[in-house]
Structure formats: structure tokens, C-alpha cells
């Protein structure tokens, strides 16, 4: 949090964003899933090993968790339970835990480079949704900045399983 310059003000603006985003999660996910679907390198993480096509059931299961992740990010406590869950999310992107939660037959791991790279499309496309409910431009900017910090912090934590012991 210190390295990210993540402050109590950021937490306050994330909390403010929850009421704005709560009824927009489906629309947000439509944008994010559209981006993933149009990017072969990303959609490959959801392909069925037998058919080579994106696994619709797997995508739907992940979508439910992704909707909850939006709300959880806006309402996170940043305590030990939160930290432990971030590490679990990281493990679920890597072998051997990827595919276990959803019993999917897909690639064994999400390539490391996509974790932090996805911070940009996720947070950039979120900004218009933050502006939809009449928040002041200054509040939208502060909510957006808080989201950028939080998402990057989370993706850094998710990268833990990819990094050599002692190098994280």
C-alpha cells in the first residue's frame, strides 16, 4: 500500500464507487469480456482443450466471480483475509490450481504478462461507468485513481506464484 501511495482517501473513494458501480456490473463485464473475446491471446486462457473453442460454461463461471470482484474491490478491508484471498486468486491463475474451481478443461496457466497488462483496459474502461451517476468530475478522477491503484496492487499480489522464491 505504501509503495502504491494507496491511502485512506483511496479507500474512501473506492467505497464511494461501490454505490455507483453496483448496478452496472453486467454492463462493465460486457465491455471487459468484449475486450477479452477480441484479443486472441486473452481468450486463449478460456479455451476448451478438447474443442479449442472458448468454454462458455467456464467464461460464465468466471464472470460471476468477476462481478463479485468489482464489488469486493470497492468494499475491500485490506486485512489479512483480503491478502490471503489475493494470493488464492493468483494461485487460481497458475498450475496446478487453474481450472480446479470451475472444473474446466483449459490451459494450465494464464501467462504472467497478462496480469498487470490487464490493469490498463480494466481501469480505463471503468472510468465512464464511474461518471454515469452524477459524481463530480473531481470525484470521478479520485475514484478512478483509487481503482487504478487497487487493481494494480491486486495484480501485483496475484503475480506472487509466478515469481521465483525470494524475488517477490
Feature-to-residue mapping (PLM):
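Heme-based O2/NO sensor domains and their adjacent alpha-helical segments
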Residues: 1-2, 22-129
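Short terminal or interdomain "cap/linker" segment that borders an active site or interface and mediates
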Residues: 1-3, 132-168
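Charged, compositionally biased N-terminal leader segments and the immediate start
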Residues: 1-12
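Short, motif-level signal for alpha-helix interfacial/capping segments enriched in acidic residues
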Residues: 16-19
